[in-house]
């Protein structure tokens, strides 16, 4: 049974608006940093840097800038998948999927004080992630998404079952927009993770403000 949306290391309120980056809408690294800053200024309390196509050296350089920006702004910095990069740049944590480095192994690399988020699509996966030491979960896909074509949507009942089963914060991810976010009301969520609903917008800061307010209205 869930508590009040907190873990030992992260408060659910920090997860109200979880920004996940995508280079598709940034011309270069400078533009990406500007977008991240705007998302934070609009209310994002945690940002995940996701890079699937950069080489190691370029990713490392970008991650250093990213972590420095998040520290300056006072928000949580998460690196997607790359545990070695997260450790090297001193990020606040890492997010891993079911097919990425297991949460237990990530904990071994990062130590006890860093945040580890895990993607889950079922109660079984959620409970396994919690048992392995996850600090929060990203569940979905909540809706059909163009960001990850292979991410099949899960039902609202499944989301509710996950949030009821675990004691750590949970955010929904996948196809979430200002038009459908309220459909997640009553699911026991601590927040939403968004990609295109934020970074594909012309005014990222305004989009963040709107999404934060909507997320606040449906949280838990």
Q: Which role fits each region the language model picked out?
A:
Residues 144-150:
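Phosphate-binding beta-alpha-beta segment of Rossmann-like dinucleotide-binding domains, i.e.
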Residues 187, 191:
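C-terminal binding/interaction regions
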Residues 139, 171-176, 192-196:
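Glycine-rich beta-strand-to-loop/alpha-helix junction loops that act as flexible
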Residues 48, 148, 170, 192-193:
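A generic, residue-level signal for flexible/boundary positions that often mark functional hotspots
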Residues 2-101, 108-136, 151-154, 161, ...:
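Conserved N-terminal beta1-alpha1 strand-loop-helix module at the mouth
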